[in-house]
Amino acid sequence: PDPLVFDKQTMEPLPLADQPHIGWLTRIAQLAVEAGAGMAFLDPVTRLIWGGMVENWHEGEHMPRAVMDTGLDFNDLCAQADAEAERLDAIIDANNDTLSAVGHWGVPCMVFEDEPFFGQDRMDLLSWRLDEAQKR
């Protein structure tokens, strides 16, 4: 399933309280970022969710196995995400505000030096820009 559930009538996302996946998923992603494993988390988890190989990515051992590849423990992340939900939600809300401020929504969207990179087809360009910036 899509991590973000929409109302079929309005095509608007359901309120966060009614979302079965996006809350815990973004919280553990934020914890991975804080642990210095954000990109390592992003690759296997996004492949699991959108790669088309697993129908119910959120069930069973699929997610714990994907997260294991990052060197992090899925159960530990979930426990920490529950314990720190308010703090993590504040960070996620601030990130959403920043995303809106640059005129974008959805994922993946990243901004580097005021240049937005939206969509998976722009990640190679972002990577190149980051590499070039390191050379300066």
PLM feature spans:
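C-terminal cap of thioredoxin/glutaredoxin-like
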Residues: 44-136
